[in-house]
Every structure is written in C-alpha cells, then in structure tokens.
C-alpha cells in the first residue's frame, strides 16, 4: 500500500483479543491499557498493529469487541466455545450495523488518522457472558443455559472486557443500537424457521448444553 499513489488510507480491524482472556484489571479497558494476548489470534492482531503503526500510511486501528451475527441460518459454531469462559465475565457487545458505521465513518474522519480506537456498543451494551448467552438463546427461541455448564475459574476469563469508547463515539457517532434491536433483528432473520425452533426447543437446548465439557463435573461438585 505504501508504494501505491492512491491507496494510502488504512482502517484496520483489530480486536479485544489483544488484551487476552483473563479479566484481572479494573474496567473499562482503555486504548493505553497494556496488552497481553493469550492466543495466536490476539498475537497476530498485535503484530499487525505494530507493523501498521510503523508504516507511512494514513492509518487508524479500530479494536473491535464482539459483534454477534444477525443471520443465524447456516451459521456454524462449536457450542463448547460458549462454555469455555466464566459465566460472570464482563462482556460488551456491539450491533453489527453499528460496527459497520464505525468503520465507514473512520475512513473519512481526519481526526481518527494515527489513532487507536476502541469500538464497542457503549454502556447500554454491557452485560455478563452468561446473561448475554441466554439473551441470544431467547432471541432464537431456545435455552436458557444452566450456570453449571460454564467453566469455573478463580479469575474471570473472557477475551476483552467493558471498554472505554468515549473518544471513538465522539469522533464517529456510531452507537445507536442495543440489546433490544439486536434481538429483534435476529428474530426477523429467522423468519419462518422460528416456529420450528420453538417446537424443537427442548431438543435444541439439550444439544447445546451437552456440548459443555464442564457440566458433569460442576454438577458433581455442586451436589457433593
């Protein structure tokens, strides 16, 4: 890009993953909070950030929180991922449309050049991992997920945390939607499939919960 006479502007999608998956700091995470990636994804994002900051491009780095998919039909995921994080871990999401707005507006924002910005939904989008999972299950017509299905840890585990998005919101004015809008949009995307999901709710919920590798042990310990 540096050799191109025209392609000089770069808005890079980084991730909260660069902060690692241990919530051992007081929220919210700020742009200058020390990073500590704990997996290859986070380390790769951090390496990209470092290379971009050393370049001569007109760059902006947007560190994005979780943006749940609106269209779930055909979306493949491993249920075990849901349970690998502490149920009481802090989580801030963002509606995908708001995330798109942030990136689109960053392209033309002169004040954003040379800056790292946290991109999240704001205070109205702050919750816990377990609560958010159950809200998403509810939007699909299944669940809820039992607390015993989630890993138990001494320190909260989740990638990222609640975020300081004051500067990004001031520059980009993108935080418009919250949990209500997210659930409405998800239900609309389900369309005619929704009644079938509700009919099969017990079976689907059972299938998701059985993917937890922690459920049996947590219930054993809880009953002992």
Enumerate the predicted regions with their spans:
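Conserved Rossmann-fold NAD(P)-dependent oxidoreductase catalytic core, especially the SDR/UDP-sugar
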Residues: 1-38, 62
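Conserved beta-loop-beta element that borders a ligand/cofactor-binding pocket
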Residues: 49-71
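Short-chain dehydrogenase/reductase
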Residues: 27-46, 89-97
């Amino acid at each position: 890009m540096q050799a191109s006479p025209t392609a000089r502007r770069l808005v890079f999608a980084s991730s909260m993953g660069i902060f690692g998956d241990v919530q051992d700091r007081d929220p919210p995470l700020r742009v200058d909070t020390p990073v500590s990636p704990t997996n290859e994804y986070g380390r790769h994002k951090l390496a990209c950030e470092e290379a971009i900051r050393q370049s001569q491009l007109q760059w902006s780095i947007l560190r994005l929180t979780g943006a749940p998919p609106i269209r779930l039909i055909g979306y493949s995921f491993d249920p075990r991922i849901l349970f690998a994080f502490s149920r009481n871990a802090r989580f801030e999401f963002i509606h995908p449309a708001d995330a798109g707005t942030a990136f689109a507006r960053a392209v033309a924002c002169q004040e954003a050049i040379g800056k790292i910005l946290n991109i999240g939904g704001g205070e109205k989008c702050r919750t816990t991992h377990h609560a958010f999972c159950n809200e998403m299950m509810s939007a699909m017509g299944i669940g809820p997920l039992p607390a015993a299905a989630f890993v138990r840890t001494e320190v909260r585990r989740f990638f990222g945390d609640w975020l300081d998005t004051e500067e990004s919101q001031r520059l980009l004015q993108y935080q418009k939607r919250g949990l209500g809008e997210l659930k409405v949009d998800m239900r609309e995307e389900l369309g005619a499939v929704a009644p079938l999901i509700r009919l099969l709710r017990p079976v689907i919920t059972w299938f998701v919960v059985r993917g937890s590798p922690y459920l049996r042990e947590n219930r054993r310990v809880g009953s002992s």
